[in-house]
Amino acid sequence: MGNSLACFCCGGGAGGRGGRHVAPAALPSDPAYDEGLGHSFCYVRPDKFVVPFSADDLVADAKAAAAAEGEATTFRAISGAALSANVSTPLSTSVLLLMPEESSASATASSGFESSESFAAVPLQPVPRFSSGPISAPFSGGFMSGPLERGFQSGPLDAALLSGPLPGTATSGRMGGAVPALRRSLSHGGRRLRNFTRALLARTEKFQDSADLGSPDAAAAAVAACGGDPCGLQWAQGKAGEDRVHVVVSEERGWVFVGIYDGFNGPDATDFLVSNLYAAVHRELRGLLWDQREQNVQHDQRPDQPGSAPSTTASDNQDQWGRRRRTRRSRPPRGADDDQRRWKCEWEQERDCSNLKPPTQQRLRCNSENDHVAVLKALTRALHRTEEAYLDIADKMVGEFPELALMGSCVLAMLMKGEDMYIMNVGDSRAVLATMDSVDLEQISQGSFDGSVGDCPPCLSAVQLTSDHSTSVEEEVIRIRNEHPDDPSAISKDRVKGSLKVTRAFGAGFLKQPKWNDALLEMFRIDYVGSSPYISCNPSLFHHKLSTRDRFLILSSDGLYQYFTNEEAVAQVEMFIATTPEGDPAQHLVEEVLFRAANKAGMDFHELIEIPHGDRRRYHDDVSVIVISLEGRIWRSCV
């Protein structure tokens, strides 16, 4: 597993939900405790990569922001949480892949998580009803808190406690009975995330030459050249219902990749994205964001005209698609066949790091507007080629597995390199930046703060960096109707062909080509008029240069915004970190979604989470949230 486990108790007093985080509590000793609700995880940057910061610097830094726009601002910590509402469904191809003893566990796990050593993670565990811990009042709800509150820490977050690598075996005696069961359950829950790629590769060998799918050895070598896990690459990936989350961090190169994939109609498209999109992004960006000693890369993707944030770009469809071969770190022998079946990151390798170029020689090459556009175009190519590979392989299997034509996913991908942040999205997931307004600086410096949320002046503004692609956006509705003038039902029941709320998506072939619609059972077919696609996978793109005004970034699936506006989400994180600097802001947002959903339905927290998966989808969607702090200022952004 690699991730260190810790769990703390949080809850609300009888008077409300404020101050839910209290003293530590042990994990339940019951080895069968549920981890299907979701998970919380974090990554805190090692001290050597962090610029020292004190609370007194906030106002001075903010006032100097305009003069320091070119100053690099890097992330300090990553907080993530995911909550499942949908029932877990097996991969369509699982009958080809799973051994009998694996199929049951894989099909029923609604949540799973796996990571390298520098991430810490725990399952979301609700505080028991009427339990009394270190405080006298009973808890009214909430989760045992996430990994940002570690050990018996009572003060602000100490980064040294979470600087990697984290020991995977250092657990207290109170947790000894729970940890082995937790690891077993997480390993079973993660198996589905690697099934689809392996099945499709095996099934399509008889349809395609090996060149069509690329050389696995060449793909593995490319990953090794990027600085794999033994040389500092850290990763995390997990699932919650139909959502998938993927994080890759390279401290040596100074970049972080985050992917949030909000699937629909099944897990195959999202699992394919987890297995392949990062690999494609890395391949397309080679030579743009880093140099490599062994290969001279020609900059043949330069745009003709400069620009910093085009909305969509077309994909070059000439290059061949490559695939990664799974490799894994050494573990105690369990049999070669069994080892092959374990879920593991695509890029994690056993390799000799001595031939890698030193970090100081891996230079950031994006230094002009043209370079930023080239990076955005490279992200688009990576997405399009990933979808082409998915649809091409699924096309060979659609006769046997017609449901593959229904499956798709929204895509939100963020790449941060130094002070440059690149955002790509398809669908209705969002990236929201919390930034400080200069007009509020004088109020902040003159205001007082006595520890209560109500006395904290609103410091930050919410800036949405993505575009929503759904029928709720009038421009998208007009575009689809203009593209299908002969089809009055192109948009019906506030959905594309009465089926899909989003107007752009990865996969969902039945809305892109008539042949995939015809492959479906009659009850699932739409009335496909003409041959033009109803939806596309053309992303919206954005480049943003971070400044000292920027405090944190919220990346999330649309489940968060069922109960929050952008401004409310930023305000919730801002107030939470002001009152609980050692807390987990992503988990707090997920918790608030449940409280708001329960309140809307006229029930309490525990009544809601006791509703089975699937039925609970009527009250809230799957929710995946990642909060990235910038220069550590998230922890003192409103002092």
Swiss-Prot record:
It is an enzyme of class 3 (hydrolase). It is found in: Cell membrane. Binds 2 magnesium or manganese ions per subunit. Mn(2+) 1 binds at D262, G263. Mn(2+) 2 binds at D262, D558, D621. It comes from the Eukaryota. Belongs to the PP2C family. It catalyses: O-phospho-L-seryl-[protein] + H2O = L-seryl-[protein] + phosphate; O-phospho-L-threonyl-[protein] + H2O = L-threonyl-[protein] + phosphate. Interacts with XA21 (via juxtamembrane and kinase domains). The keyword Heme does not apply. Disruption phenotype: Enhanced resistance to Xanthomonas oryzae pv. oryzae (Xoo), expression of defense-related genes and cell death (necrotic lesions). This is Protein phosphatase 2C 35. Its main location: membrane. Its EC number is 3.1.3.16. Keywords: Cell membrane, Hydrolase, Magnesium, Manganese, Membrane, Metal-binding, Plant defense, Protein phosphatase. Residues 227-630 form the PPM-type phosphatase domain. Residues 323-332 have a biased composition (Basic residues). It is a peripheral membrane protein. Residues 308-320 have a biased composition (Polar residues). One of its GO terms (cellular component) is plasma membrane. Residues 295-341 are annotated as: Disordered.
